[in-house]
């Protein structure tokens, strides 16, 4: 056993270059304080107990995360440290707090269970923590190393070397600060590292060579400032790029220069050719120069035309590597997007100012193809290469959007709109490739024609209209505000209520299947009663027999109907689908005109969120695009199919129409299970639906790293074989999925001006899901009849034409 331990230690020390300790002549530097403040205010204070000045360039700090034995952070110290003096290394957040007390900025990322080691010429001489160990509760028994800052008890370090894999005794070597954020006892060295002067005649390293250069070293760089983000809430820096005549092919010729807000460094503006010297490092997987110690020198102030934007076209050939059409090839450079690109997602537009752009609308792969099929995999890969984020050039949140000009609830930016002539700086930030606009350059043109807001298609008076509507946690606050899942205040709820009522009235359905309505009973103060009353005296809601509420969740499904157009037939029937899927409800109706029957069954299956899932179960995410809880949703579908086979409402002709948020895209296993049982999935049907263009929800274009984001329909209308021939058409009314989230009823994070500017008492962004609408001709010939196909086609064409003309005249 001893032999094994010695051999292990020998291998470890060899890996650090510890072949000889003879070069260690003085008392060693040591960690004197370990700083783990909140909000990333992290640092390490280093003390020189020796009687002579120490060259810090001989020392390196290494970090080993999460019990690993391979270093995750490593950087050399800079300058010198006089006898009995201290040197403070810290993150930029600590420098913002302490200013010049921080002698060297470094990307420290320890969390109390990560080891940090001080290394002298390859030999470990001090440490905090233990390499190869990740204690669940941190090191220490009296006070845990997690979430605390510490001061060293010892004041000398006689060790020639240490074993950083040996047990770590926090209790006897370190004392915890009373307040982890009290930095008053930190004192960096007053002896600053020597600053090498830089002038326009100084030699420099080509920017193109920096990608292969050693990081944590200083370099002199020359280039033209193409974009300057040193303004309020900007990115605290600027981009420099090599002039086109000196640029190198197939490699980036630009780099970001970071200058913290607390820095006194100044100089340079867009169009200047400058020279500067600083440390090469990486932040968020993007190279940058930081720690500038002198002002930026301008060598030529008329160089703006020497850097022209490079055309960046989608799709990329790859997202990595230096191919001629990979984003890495253009990183940091001034680019233009010559293609007219579609806004495929605006989910983060209100919060972060981000728009996802792509070649046409991107679709969820499993909305078009079965999970793990070659087609689904190919589409996911295509999606990854066909998108880019267009940002707003700011680093703060909840700004008023800048596109289009004078953005408001009436002047929105929908998914499906297009941007033309966009340009800016291509960069990698927040785990995504994006283009940052440049102040003073051309603003892109917003094209609204590809996907304008449209009125709902007019209903034929002889048809029955059934609609599915997810009402986004509609809760009237019967027991007060804030509600469990819905509005926080009465004012918010009033806004939500007006928008949803506006949408319901515009749709003009005869029956609605609702999802996400508060499960607070059926009395006069209930959410369902409150909503139904707002539609008028003709409207009623279905009350399950002998039930105070439907299932045990905070939200439920419900049915409301126009009593002058349809009347309930027999009693409603309930199916309990267990504690994961919401309880479902079935009610048969008879049309007042023609007396034909049909049955409406609203459903809301288990979400794709992985919250609460057992990671070892089949309900966990199988990385097939279907998310978590897929078997649970399939099981629910099987239960529903078996239940409906027994005709639970006991009518002569069931004509079942299932509607709702199935939390499953059109080609995922739950929906395919319906098809196997001879049900027809209407919205995706090529005859009566919208085929491959169907969607009711947009999600994950920017955030999904596997290409599974895009448009698709979680919301469905599914007919049994008997009802399908009576379906005239099925469509999603795109009032929600394409609209920015900041137009909804929520008031959080909005100024008073924004609250007024972003809100409209209309149907748009009344929810996050689009309503799905089904028109039924219960009295006519089956829609599958060829003659009916012609009639319905003419009717649809005329209806669409009238709708288009009305929108045209409104715009004019």
Report residues per predicted region.
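N-terminal signal peptide c-region/cleavage motif recognized by signal peptidases
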Residues: 20-22
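A structural motif detector for short, solvent-exposed N-terminal "entry" segments of globular domains
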Residues: 25-66, 110-111, 196-235
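Intrinsically disordered, low-complexity Pro/Gly/Ser/Thr-rich segments with frequent PxxP/GP/PP motifs
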Residues: 71-96
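Divalent cation-coordinating acidic motifs and surrounding scaffolds
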Residues: 82, 94-95, 131-144, 157-160, ...
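Extended non-catalytic accessory segments flanking core domains
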Residues: 132-137, 179-487, 491-501, 534, ...
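Composition-driven, intrinsically disordered low-complexity tracts enriched in small residues
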Residues: 784-812
